[in-house]
Amino acid sequence: MMAAKKRVTAAKDKWKLKQWYIIYAPDFFGGVEVGLTPADDPEKVMNRVVEVTLKDITGDFTKGHVKLYFQVYDVKGQNAYTKFKGMKLARSYIRSLVRRRTTRIDGIFNITTKDGYRLRVMAMAIAMRRIQTSQERAIRKIMQEIIYKKAEELNFKDFVLEAVNGKIAAEIAKEGKKIYPLKKAEIRKIKVLGEPEAA
């Protein structure tokens, strides 16, 4: 019984030693506060990953399906600063786009941005009807051309913002419609594979 009480007391004391750290989004997402995390040592905050939605950052309720992942890379005092690690669309949102008699076209592309960041970008488009394999290939080729071109032209921050805000997907939809009417195009996932040496 005494041992159990000691364990409870020790746990309480350990919790008392913990401090709350404020987590901030990367500067190119406005550097806004995105959460709090407890730790008894600032080193334990390093590399923690926080998931937020684009709605949390912008206040735009139509962006609740866009999930963003930020990783802590620096701690100063009670402030924890993050870098972008990836994004993905909520599964429920993707399911809502794919209906009977539609065609989902997926593309996965490994790219390097103008400033040397390596990313895996997953795009998708939804055609209004069942389409031919040749049309799928043509739309996938459009995805590839647009995403590769953007990677050559844009630095990491601008590429991520254009992807997250739907600008790249809008270009894919516009060009893809020349092959077949599309219900929607989306960048559904981004993963950071590597950073330039000096980053």
From Swiss-Prot:
Belongs to the eukaryotic ribosomal protein eS1 family. PROSITE patterns: RIBOSOMAL_S3AE. This is Small ribosomal subunit protein eS1. The gene is rps3ae. It comes from the Archaea. Coiled coil: none annotated. NCBIfam families: PRK04057.1 (NF003142). It comes from Pyrococcus horikoshii (strain ATCC 700860 / DSM 12428 / JCM 9974 / NBRC 100139 / OT-3). GO terms for molecular function: structural constituent of ribosome. One of its GO terms (biological process) is translation. One of its GO terms (cellular component) is ribosome. Keywords: Ribonucleoprotein, Ribosomal protein.
